[in-house]
């Protein structure tokens, strides 16, 4: 009762300056811009925004950040999928095979139709590289504003939308890899450049109190930073991105909200930042989040009755108020799987 009274009459109730002078970057959701945001993104959004608000209330200088993965293999598949659907519109579906590993959703067909409506059939005569570059650009120009709109509806306002492509275009990924090489943490094998992740992790775990015997029993593996074809891996870009946060932009700490399926990546990224002298083991904080199961009438719901597609954030917000959704997502620890009861939330 006291808290409710204070919230109504004392706008600054509970605010402290304990975090004064410390700058925290809180990165959350960061969904691939290749399709609509899903239930897992909804949980990460509620958790990340709540955590950022708490840090802000405790006096920290907080930046809410969304990392847009607009480079790499996922975007290549995205462009390839739109391109195939576009060519099917122009040349006939029976004449253009769809790539097996492409994105099969109706949203890809809608993007291809949108591109066709704007540009007509003329792009069929362009080179595949030129055509797919245009498809990626068009698809992102449609999807990213939709993501921003959905997140604003979800009462999340970001301070920074950071494009992965800027790290590659500026040479920052290559520079970061060269720094690791200069510190002796890389080696070449089979034409590729590898990070000695095994040694970095061993040193990290020993510093954290593990014995040599315990460390020797771990199944550790090294990571490719630059493939034999000259392209940098997602891990190399991720190291560069977090170096950008901790070194170039000077945040005291970087806090990331990740799905629990990325747990194997946590120590590796921290260790790589340790190798750069950035104390990643202490300055990079990863909050892992378990899956969400949507229930209706006590049964799992995987598809939207309205659209026939997987449940997206916007579908959820058509059924449930924003405050109810955010409350439910934060009602259990992020380390526990969450059953989201749609009937209860609507009531």
Predicted regions, residues:
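NTP-dependent nucleotidyl-transfer catalytic core
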Residues: 1-347
């Amino acid at each position: 009762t006291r808290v409710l009274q204070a919230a109504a009459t004392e706008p600054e109730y509970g605010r402290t300056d304990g975090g004064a002078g410390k700058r925290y970057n809180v990165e959350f959701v960061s969904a691939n811009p290749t399709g609509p945001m899903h239930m897992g993104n909804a949980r990460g959004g509620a958790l990340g925004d709540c955590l950022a608000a708490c840090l802000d209330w405790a006096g920290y200088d907080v930046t809410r950040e969304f990392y847009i993965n607009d480079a790499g293999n996922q975007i290549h598949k995205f462009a390839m999928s739109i391109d195939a659907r576009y060519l099917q519109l122009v040349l006939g579906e029976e004449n253009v095979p769809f790539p097996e590993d492409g994105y099969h959703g109706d949203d890809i067909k809608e993007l291809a139709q949108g591109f066709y409506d704007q540009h007509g059939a003329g792009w069929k005569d362009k080179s595949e590289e030129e055509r797919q570059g245009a498809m990626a650009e068009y698809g992102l120009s449609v999807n990213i504003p939709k993501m921003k709109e959905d997140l604003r509806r979800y009462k999340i306002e970001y301070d920074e939308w950071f494009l992965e492509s800027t790290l590659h275009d500026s040479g920052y990924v290559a520079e970061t890899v060269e720094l690791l090489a200069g510190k002796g943490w890389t080696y070449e094998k089979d034409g590729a450049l590898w990070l000695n992740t095994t040694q970095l992790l061993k040193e990290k775990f020993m510093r954290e109190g593990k014995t040599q015997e315990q460390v020797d029993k771990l199944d550790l593996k090294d990571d490719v930073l630059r493939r034999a074809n000259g392209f940098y891996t997602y891990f190399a870009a991720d190291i560069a991105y977090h170096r950008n946060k901790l070194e170039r932009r000077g945040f005291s700490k970087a806090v990331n909200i990740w799905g629990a399926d990325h747990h194997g990546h946590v120590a590796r990224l921290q260790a790589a930042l340790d190798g750069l002298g950035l104390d990643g083991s202490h300055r990079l904080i990863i909050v892992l989040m378990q899956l969400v199961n949507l229930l209706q009438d006590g049964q799992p719901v995987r598809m939207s009755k309205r659209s026939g597609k997987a449940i997206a954030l916007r579908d959820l917000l058509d059924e449930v108020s924003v405050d109810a959704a955010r409350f439910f997502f934060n009602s259990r620890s992020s380390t526990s799987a969450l059953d989201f009861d749609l009937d209860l939330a609507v009531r």
